[in-house]
């Protein structure tokens, strides 16, 4: 369905982009993703899907977990695309027929007609990746979604910081793809096989070969690079901070889901979890991610860089669950991935909402909220948004009874039950330390006074002018703020309520991840 949508959108944009406002393409894409989610959900009731259904000559294998994650990816993709719809009223928008964009007269923002198309390409690559059962389909899927996110990072060509960040993303992402391709080539040269099933049979019947181990570890290093796990994380803070906030929302959430689920399936298909070298690599990366993500975040004063280091820390929890690879850990991995993805998206929804409230006082037309100090006193401006952000940050910190606490508790229980007491202790320690920078944001929002216009001007001329990553500043401090759209308000309210009231009825989500885990291990 997504492939059909991609082909249809290519034709529609080519033929009708000069006559149809670009925002309509965005809404059509959202409807398409929702319908794709419905189709994937219905496919879960097929009789043979539990054991896996091979398609395209075995290049892809459709299973319960692939279809379940497809539903999640499609729904999240539809939510993120809502952010690209401007919160302006209809009379403040005009259609520019020269470049097929919908232009906001007050600030020069635009909704690109190509944005939803590229997002669809990215979703298609993610869906293909988690269903891959062959080295060839794996690499093609990785490149399909990678090229899409490279373009997304640089799609706003007026932004110099986004162009710089996108170039860095492309160059270093190409390096990780080269490592994956090198590992795949070596693996094929040593085994003569590309299918995961064939590799599983070979590894089960023969002794472990050092050359094969090196090949697989090269693939794993490339995948860890893609999810910005330490020590392969250095590109992430600059890239996520440089691109527009709307694009950052996509980059920090969507690709990571696909890559992490693929790692889970890859080690399940090939029984790599039984290799000590594979497990040790995951454990070392998990430990470094926990430490670097926490310590690095303490020194940040830019909100998106801080959230990037927070993401690195959470990736450490996910890698810890992957390294253990038993029923408890896989269940905790899926639960943690779902709850963190929802929380992270909600945080960026709220940041975009605060950017609307700032209006022309924002530091950039693409990323109005860049500094933590810009959020001073925003609780007094909009108490509900301030409270929602506090709830999300408390959940990320693992404060009970929010859903983030149960995610960390499940991972730590699996780690201690498997004998990884040291890593469990480190995870508890970094959770306590990371609460410091979450509480710093909450303190700025709720207890600091609203800065005067002169203070905002000082921020512009001193802090921002010295930062090479920010060049699209909005020089006007006067002007009205924009209104938050009803759809964005509904998304923020719904996710926030889910974080709060999960404890009242946790059965649906817990049962779902439990059934997926049982299917993965016992079908």
UniProtKB/Swiss-Prot annotation:
Chain segments annotated as transmembrane: 3-23, 30-50, 62-82, 110-130, 135-155, 170-190, 212-232, 246-266, 281-301, 306-326, 333-353, 386-406, 419-439, 490-510
Function recorded in the entry: Core subunit of the mitochondrial membrane respiratory chain NADH dehydrogenase (Complex I) that is believed to belong to the minimal assembly required for catalysis. Complex I functions in the transfer of electrons from NADH to the respiratory chain. The immediate electron acceptor for the enzyme is believed to be ubiquinone.
Gene name as annotated: ND2
Name of the molecule in the record: NADH-ubiquinone oxidoreductase chain 2
Family: Belongs to the complex I subunit 2 family.
Claim: Transport is one of the keywords in the record: yes
Keyword Membrane (UniProt): yes
UniProt xrefs under NCBIfam families: NDH_I_N
Broad enzyme group: translocase
Catalytic activity: a ubiquinone + NADH + 5 H(+)(in) = a ubiquinol + NAD(+) + 4 H(+)(out)
EC number: 7.1.1.2
Superkingdom classification of source: Eukaryota
Keywords per UniProt: Electron transport, Membrane, Mitochondrion, Mitochondrion inner membrane, NAD, Respiratory chain, Translocase, Transmembrane, Transmembrane helix, Transport, Ubiquinone
Membrane topology: Multi-pass membrane protein
Subcellular location: Mitochondrion inner membrane
Biological processes, Gene Ontology terms: ATP synthesis coupled electron transport
Entry GO MF terms: NADH dehydrogenase (ubiquinone) activity
Any one Gene Ontology cellular component term annotated for this protein: mitochondrial inner membrane
């Amino acid at each position: 369905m997504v492939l059909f949508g991609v082909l249809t959108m290519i034709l529609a944009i080519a033929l009708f982009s000069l006559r149809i406002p670009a925002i309509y393409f965005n809404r059509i894409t959202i409807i398409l993703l929702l319908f794709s989610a419905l189709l994937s959900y219905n496919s879960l009731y097929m009789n043979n899907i539990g054991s896996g259904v091979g398609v395209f000559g075995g290049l892809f294998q459709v299973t319960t977990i692939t279809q379940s994650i497809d539903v999640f990816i499609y729904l999240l993709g539809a939510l993120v695309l809502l952010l690209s719809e401007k919160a302006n009223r209809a009379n403040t928008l005009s259609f520019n027929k020269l470049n097929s964009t919908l232009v906001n007269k007050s600030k020069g923002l635009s909704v690109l007609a190509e944005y939803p198309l590229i997002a669809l390409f990215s979703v298609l690559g993610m869906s293909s990746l988690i269903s891959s059962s062959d080295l060839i389909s794996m690499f093609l899927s990785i490149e399909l979604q990678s090229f899409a996110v490279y373009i997304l990072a640089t799609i706003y060509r007026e932004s110099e910081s986004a162009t710089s960040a996108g170039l860095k993303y492309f160059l270093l992402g190409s390096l990780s793809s080269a490592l994956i391709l090198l590992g795949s080539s070596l693996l094929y040269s040593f085994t003569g096989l590309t299918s995961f099933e064939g590799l599983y049979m070979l590894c089960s019947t023969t002794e472990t070969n050092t050359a094969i181990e090196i090949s697989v570890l090269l693939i794993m290093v490339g995948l860890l690079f893609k999810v910005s796990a330490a020590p392969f994380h250095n590109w992430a803070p600059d890239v996520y901070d440089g691109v527009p906030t709307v694009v950052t929302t996509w980059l920090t959430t969507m690709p990571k889901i696909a890559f992490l689920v693929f790692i889970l399936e890859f080690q399940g298909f090939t029984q790599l979890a039984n290799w000590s070298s594979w497990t040790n690599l995951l454990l070392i990366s998990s430990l470094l991610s926990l430490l670097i993500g926490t310590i690095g975040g303490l020194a940040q004063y830019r909100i998106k860089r801080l959230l990037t280091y927070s993401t690195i820390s959470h990736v450490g929890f996910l890698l810890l669950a992957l390294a253990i690879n038993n029923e408890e850990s896989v269940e905790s991995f899926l639960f943690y991935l779902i709850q963190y993805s929802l929380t992270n998206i909600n945080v960026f929804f709220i940041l975009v909402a605060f950017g609307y409230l700032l209006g022309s006082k924002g530091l950039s037309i693409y990323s109005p909220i860049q500094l933590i100090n810009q959020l001073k006193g925003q609780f007094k401006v909009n108490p509900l948004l301030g409270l929602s952000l506090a709830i999300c940050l408390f959940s990320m910190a693992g404060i009970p009874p929010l859903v983030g606490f149960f995610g960390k508790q499940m991972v730590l229980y699996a780690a201690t039950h498997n004998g990884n007491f040291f890593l469990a202790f480190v995870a508890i320690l970094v959770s306590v330390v990371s609460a410091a920078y979450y509480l710093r944001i909450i303190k700025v929002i709720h207890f600091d006074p609203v800065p005067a216009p002169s203070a905002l001007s000082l921020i512009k001329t001193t802090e921002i002018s010295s930062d090479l990553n920010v060049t699209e500043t909005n020089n006007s401090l006067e002007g009205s703020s924009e209104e938050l759209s009803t759809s964005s308000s509904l998304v923020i309210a719904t996710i926030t309520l889910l974080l709060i009231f999960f404890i009242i009825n946790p059965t649906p989500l817990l049962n779902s991840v439990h059934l997926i885990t049982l299917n993965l291990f016992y079908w």
